[in-house]
Amino acid sequence: MKYVFEMLDEVKSTKKIEDKIQVLQSYNSIWALKDVLRGTYDTSLEWDLPKGAPPFEANQGFNAPANLLQEHKQFKYLVIGEASKNLPKLRREMLYIKLLESIHPKDAEVVINMTSQKNITGVSKTVVQKAFPNLIPT
C-alpha cells in the first residue's frame, strides 16, 4: 500500500483534470487520503491547533512506527468538535506532535499543510469535489 504523500504525488504528476479525477477515484476506499483532502479544503472544519509546524522530531521514514493510513483516525481530536471538546489544549497538541513523529516525514508534511489548510499543489479543491462529490460542501 502506498503512503498518502505518494498518492498525492501520483495525482500531481498527471496533467489533465480528467486524469487527476480518475487517479483520486482509484483511491476511493482510502479514507486517510479523503480525510486529508477534506481537512485541507473543507472550510467548515476548524483545526484547534497553533498555525504552522510544531516542534517535532521527524523519524527517518524507513523506520516510521506508524502509518497515516491508520493514524488519520486521530484527526477528530484535532478539530473543534464533539470528540475534542473535553480534551485539554496541551494534550491535543501533544497528540498532534506524537502523530507527526510516528508517521513518514513526507506524510507529516502533508498533515501540517492540511492543518494549516494550505492548498495542495497540483490537486485543486475543484478536482477533489469532482472526484468525491459528497466529501466537501460547495
Cite the ranges covered by each PLM segment.
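N-terminal nucleic-acid-engaging modules of covalent nucleotidyltransferase systems
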Residues: 1-138
